[in-house]
């Protein structure tokens, strides 16, 4: 790689690493004050877990030599046989794996033990994230059939969003959910997290070009375009039911960012307007559906990341025109391939997450006690409080 490309990759890696604590702020503002430290800590712990797991095992599962299209072999275990010139790519992909695990905190907030999250995080990254990353990016079978995922719509967002749904269904509702309102305690904190996520997403998407080139420039612009349209469309959709909330603007921006992720290197800015606009409305509708169904997926990872990732994967097959072609450009087959990849990732992540979560529950128990939940996880899990 040229020195300029190395510099851009390192900057992008730092931006993506920033996204995990930014997600902690985004989530932390939406929980009650008695659980804010626990929620943010889980996101930091996700970064720590994956940083170690990736070096020891994760990278070789995802990017080792292909074995039957399903997994990488152990050629890179402990980063053995990885040249120093590839360390930037290793770190960049590690940051992706870390935030993917952190997204799942949405389904665990305010009721799950830290010890259970530690064990689950190791297992989930190894048996869900790493194999899907290999299928799509590491020369696996989805890459072989021609499925497109520029920066992680399938690998990151579908896998985490539908894993969060599986966990929410298994863990069950927070005590009092549906009986009284469980309100966010600090929306400005969530807005700060949104701003940092939006900023970091430029590294997430434009950095996935792996070079400082025209593809990165395109990805940078369409990322911002889709985020803006997502924020506006969610805001206007919610306005039809009442006042437009600041939390809706934040969620819409994230929905737009999620949806453009798989498409960022393949679509033009006009297509990004459509992708982001649809994402805001579709993800808002998914959130309303979740609430109506009584599913306590606390911070809406399923609605925003799962559904947004599904739409983004499909939209890539519709609008791709830069470096690949989709339905609009006359390639209907690409749309079919995108649907296949999205459905496979959805089913695999959901089912394997259920299995892993049941195993963790049997081993150490997932939920805190009702008394611990009542006093809050900040005190019961950390013996700390956020505010005095």
Curated annotation (Swiss-Prot):
It is found in: Cell membrane. Keywords: Ammonia transport, Cell membrane, Membrane, Transmembrane, Transmembrane helix, Transport. GO terms for cellular component: plasma membrane. The chain crosses the membrane at residues 6-26, 44-64, 89-109, 117-137, 150-170, 187-207, 220-240, 247-267, 269-289, 309-329, 335-355. InterPro entries: Ammonium/urea_transptr, Ammonium_transpt, Ammonium_transpt_CS, NH4_transpt_AmtB-like_dom. One of its GO terms (molecular function) is ammonium channel activity. It holds the Pfam family Ammonium_transp. It is a multi-pass membrane protein. The record marks 157, 305 as: Twin-His motif. Important for optimum substrate conductance. The keyword Transmembrane helix applies. Homotrimer. Involved in the uptake of ammonium/ammonia (NH(4)(+)/NH(3)). Transport is electrogenic. Transport the ammonium and methylammonium cation with high specificity. Belongs to the ammonia transporter channel (TC 1.A.11.2) family. This is Ammonium transporter Amt3. It comes from Archaeoglobus fulgidus (strain ATCC 49558 / DSM 4304 / JCM 9628 / NBRC 100126 / VC-16).
């Amino acid at each position: 790689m040229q020195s300029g490309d190395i510099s851009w990759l390192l900057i992008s890696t730092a931006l993506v690493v920033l996204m995990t604590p930014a997600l902690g702020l985004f989530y932390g503002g939406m929980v009650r004050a008695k659980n804010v430290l626990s929620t943010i800590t889980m996101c930091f712990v996700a970064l720590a877990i994956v940083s170690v797991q990736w070096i020891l095992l994760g990278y070789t599962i995802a990017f080792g030599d292909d074995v039957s299209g399903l997994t990488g072999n152990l050629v890179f275990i402990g980063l053995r046989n990885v040249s120093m010139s590839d360390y930037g790519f290793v770190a960049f992909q590690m940051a992706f794996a870390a935030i993917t695990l952190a997204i799942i905190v949405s389904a665990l907030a305010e009721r799950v033990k830290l010890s259970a999250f530690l064990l689950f995080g190791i297992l989930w990254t190894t048996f869900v994230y790493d194999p899907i990353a290999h299928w799509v990016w590491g020369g696996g079978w989805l890459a072989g059939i021609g499925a497109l995922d520029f920066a992680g719509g399938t690998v990151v967002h579908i896998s985490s969003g539908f894993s969060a749904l599986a966990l929410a269904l298994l863990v069950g509702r927070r005590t009092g959910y549906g009986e009284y309102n469980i309100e966010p305690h600090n929306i400005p904190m969530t807005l700060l997290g949104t701003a940092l996520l939006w900023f970091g997403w430029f590294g997430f998407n434009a950095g996935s070009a792996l070079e400082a080139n025209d593809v990165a420039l395109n990805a940078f612009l369409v990322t911002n375009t889709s985020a803006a349209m997502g924020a506006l469309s969610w805001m206007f959709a919610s306005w039809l039911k009442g006042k437009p909330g600041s939390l809706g603007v934040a969620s819409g921006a994230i929905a737009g960012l999620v949806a453009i992720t798989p498409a960022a290197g393949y679509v033009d800015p006009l297509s990004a307007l459509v992708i982001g606009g649809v994402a805001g409305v579709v993800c808002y509708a998914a959130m309303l559906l979740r609430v109506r169904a009584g599913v306590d997926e606390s911070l809406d990872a399923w609605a925003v990341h799962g559904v947004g990732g599904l739409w983004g994967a499909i939209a890539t097959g519709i609008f791709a025109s830069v470096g690949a072609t989709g339905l609009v450009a006359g390639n209907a087959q690409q749309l079919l391939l995108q649907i296949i990849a999205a459905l496979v990732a959805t089913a695999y992540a959901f089912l394997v997450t259920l299995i892993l979560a049941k195993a963790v529950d049997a081993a150490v128990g997932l939920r805190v006690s009702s008394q611990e939940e009542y006093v809050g996880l900040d005190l019961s899990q950390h013996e700390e409080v956020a505010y005095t």
